[in-house]
A protein has these predicted regions:
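A short, N-terminal "cap"/entry segment at the start of jelly-roll beta-barrel domains
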Residues: 1-38
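Conserved short histidine dyad/triad with adjacent acidic residue
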Residues: 27-31, 42-57
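Short, surface-exposed secondary-structure edge patches
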Residues: 43, 63, 77-81
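A generic "binding-loop/recognition-motif" signal
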Residues: 48, 59-60, 78, 94-95, ...
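Short beta-strand His + acidic residue motifs that chelate non-heme Fe in jelly-roll/DSBH
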Residues: 54, 73-74, 90, 96-103
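Glycine- and acidic-residue-biased ligand/ion/polar-headgroup-sensing regions
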Residues: 59-61, 65-71
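Short acidic-glycine-tyrosine-enriched beta hairpin
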Residues: 77-92
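A short hydrophobic beta-strand segment most commonly corresponding to one strand
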Residues: 89, 104-116
Length: 116
């Protein structure tokens, strides 16, 4: 199966999970287009000053891979800086958040929500 960018679903989420600004979520594949146990296979774009607020994942795990930009990542209360090529995982029952605290560069992450 091939899916062209123009056929992907893009959603703008304002104050996602209590964060600042907006997150642009692009579903690379939608449910029904794959057989695995996932809730999201896509990218998330955060412009400078935007973030996804702290939240807990229950019955799922979330993986981020930084495609471009610099992320300020809260991993269970510990803040880390992630750069292009870095990845992180939030396991079930854990808390995380992600922010673009830069002044002039976008942050784009590949995101996978694995359900169980």
């Amino acid at each position: 199966m091939i899916k062209r960018h123009e056929n992907m679903t893009e959603t703008v989420k304002v104050n996602m999970r209590g964060g600042d600004g907006q997150a642009v979520v692009t579903d690379i594949l939608n449910k029904g287009e794959y057989k695995g146990h996932a809730r999201l296979l896509g990218t998330i774009l955060l412009e400078p000053g935007c973030s996804i607020g702290a939240h807990v994942h229950e019955n799922e795990e979330e993986v981020f891979y930084v495609i471009e930009g610099t992320a300020t990542y809260n991993d269970n209360g510990k803040t880390e800086i992630l750069h292009k090529g870095d990845s992180c995982i939030c396991l079930g029952g854990e808390t995380h958040s992600i922010a673009n605290r830069t002044e002039n560069e976008n942050l784009t992450v590949f995101a996978v929500f694995l359900t169980f």
